[in-house]
Amino acid sequence: MGCRGRQPLRECVRYDFFCEKGAAGMQKVNYQKMLEGIIKKHEEKGEVPTLLLHSCCAPCSSYVLEYLSQYFKITVFYYNPNIYPREEYDKRVAELQRLIAQMPMKNPVTFVERGYDEGEFFQAVKGFEDIPEGGERCFRCYRLRLERTAQLAKELGMDYFTTTLSISPYKNAQKLNEISEELGEVYDVKALPADFKKREGYKRSVQLSAEYGLYRQDYCGCIFSKRERERLDTITTKSE
C-alpha cells in the first residue's frame, strides 16, 4: 500500500520507498528522496535534463540554484503577481537577476519573467482574503503560480518543472507537491518532487544570502502577509 492511498508519481517505481513515519504514525512522503532518485537516474544515463524553476525570490532561490544547477539546465521563471507593492516586486526581481549573474553554476541558467499583474492574484484568492496565513488562500496562490509554471514548461518543451517555495519553513511542501503533481498530469509535463528545506537547505540559503548580500524580505509577499507582519511588529513595539 502506498502513502495514504495516493497514487505514485510517474517517476517512481515504489512509492512506499519514499515514505517516512510522521506524527502519530502517519505516513509522509519524503520528496527529497524522490528528487535524489530522479537525479541518480539521469546521472547514470549521462543526461542533463531541462527544468523550469519557478522562483519566489533570490534568497529562496540561492540554495536551490546551487544544488539543482549541478544536475539540470535551468530556466528560472519569475511569476509572482501576489507580491505587493510594485516596488517590492521590482526589488525582488532585481535581486534574483543579480544572483543569477553572480553565482557560479555548473550548467546554464537562464531567466524569464512574466509581467506583473496583481489582478490575477486577487482574482485567484477572491472570497478567501480573510483566511489566516498558511490556509486556503495560500494554497490558491500556490496553484496560480504553479499552473502558469506548468503551462510554460509544456510550451517550452522542458523535461520538468518545480518551485523554490518548499524551501521556506512556512510553506506546505506536501501541498506544493500535490498541486504540482496534479498540474503535471493536466499539462503533460513532469513535476519534479522537492522539499528544499531538507538537507539543511533553508540554513544554506541564509548563508548564501549573507555571502551575496541579498535583500531578505520580512514577509511572504502579498498584501495580506504584509499587513500581518505590520500587525505583529506593532504588538512587539508596544510590549517593549
Per-region residue spans from a language model:
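Nucleotide-activated chemistry modules centered on ATP-dependent adenylation/adenylyltransferase
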Residues: 12-14, 22-240
